[in-house]
Amino acid sequence: MFEKPTRRLSVILARETAESRWEDHRWQLLGVVPDVGGEARVIVETSETLQRIFPGFEVTLYRDEAEGYFLNASSETPSVFVSIRQDEESEDPYPFQATLSYNEAARWMDGGEKVDRVVAWPDLAAWMGAWVEANYRPEPKKRQRPRSFEGKEGRLRKEGDR
């Protein structure tokens, strides 16, 4: 059976003190690193910040998403897109899924998901770029016939169209 190219990664979220009267802290996507394994855990805790790492995410490259990977790989800063949800009890955010496809991330956002992006580490960006180079073929543009080939009826307005 054909195996799809997959990389495992860990997502890091950070809670930082906010200088605001409406909120005392704010969460943000801090980074994505090669998978460290194990369970979600706190990796940094100070009076001003809390960082949690969430291991065990996979990004798999699919041929039908090749255009989305191409758009990402050819951008100035290739990124990992992470869908983030909020725990109903603690109200803390947690990463739900990750992708390298611009198009897939856009579909998630269209569906109401909160999606953040973070720069992909160099090896991950190179891996995606090599896959795109080997697998992505843009769809050929359909040539439009010049209007001169439509004949007189297609170029001239009909009596009732004036």
Predicted ranges, named:
Residues 124-136:
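Amphipathic alpha-helical interface segments used for dimerization/assembly
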Residues 1-119, 137-162:
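Terminal targeting/leader modules
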